[in-house]
């Protein structure tokens, strides 16, 4: 179930938005009723979107996690709140804490952010699988180069996996601008 951070929490460190949370829970409950599994997938690429004038537009600002406008603590806050809301659903297969982070700050690398998030979630949910995407769009072909530091992450509950992505175009970018033919 992909979702956007700014839709579920319109103000960093604020409450979860009830209407969006209710939609998520309705979907999750339907999946549970059908004995299906759900992966909650924050689809923000390592960023928080600040809407221009409070609405979605081309003037939106995408703020990278780890700077003063969007701190690691802000990121941990939303996941701690989400985990508290969803921990009792049996159909939740895992929390994909961030889809395809890229261009993270050198001062706050993705592995630092991920470890803080792991710790925050485990304060409220010790059962659910944690899914950690690699750096630079979770690149499988460049994993050793860009995501090797993730091997040092520690889940105190030992229930964590890594997620790598492969795009089958000539440069593994996912743009498919050139054919293999």
Show which residues each predicted segment covers.
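Catalytic domains of carbohydrate-active enzymes, especially glycoside hydrolases
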Residues: 1-4
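An active-site-proximal structural segment forming one wall of the substrate-binding cleft
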Residues: 9-94, 110-123
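Extracellular glycoside hydrolase catalytic/binding regions
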Residues: 77-94, 98-181
């Amino acid at each position: 179930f992909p979702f956007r951070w700014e839709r579920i929490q319109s103000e960093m460190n604020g409450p979860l938005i009830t209407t969006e949370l209710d939609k998520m829970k309705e979907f999750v409950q339907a999946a549970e009723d059908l004995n299906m599994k759900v992966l909650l997938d924050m689809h923000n690429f390592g960023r928080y979107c600040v809407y221009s004038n409070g609405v979605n537009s081309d003037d939106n600002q995408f703020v990278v996690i780890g700077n003063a406008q969007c701190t690691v603590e802000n990121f941990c806050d939303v996941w701690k709140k989400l985990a508290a809301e969803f921990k009792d659903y049996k159909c939740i297969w895992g929390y994909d804490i961030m889809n395809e982070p890229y261009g993270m700050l050198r001062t706050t690398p993705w592995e630092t952010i991920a470890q803080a998030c792991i710790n925050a979630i485990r304060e409220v949910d010790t059962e659910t699988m944690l899914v950690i995407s690699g750096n630079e769009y979770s690149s499988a072909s460049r994993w050793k180069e860009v995501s090797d530091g993730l091997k040092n992450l520690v889940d105190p509950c030992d229930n964590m996996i890594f997620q790598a992505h492969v795009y089958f175009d000539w440069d593994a970018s996912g743009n498919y601008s050139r054919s293999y033919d």
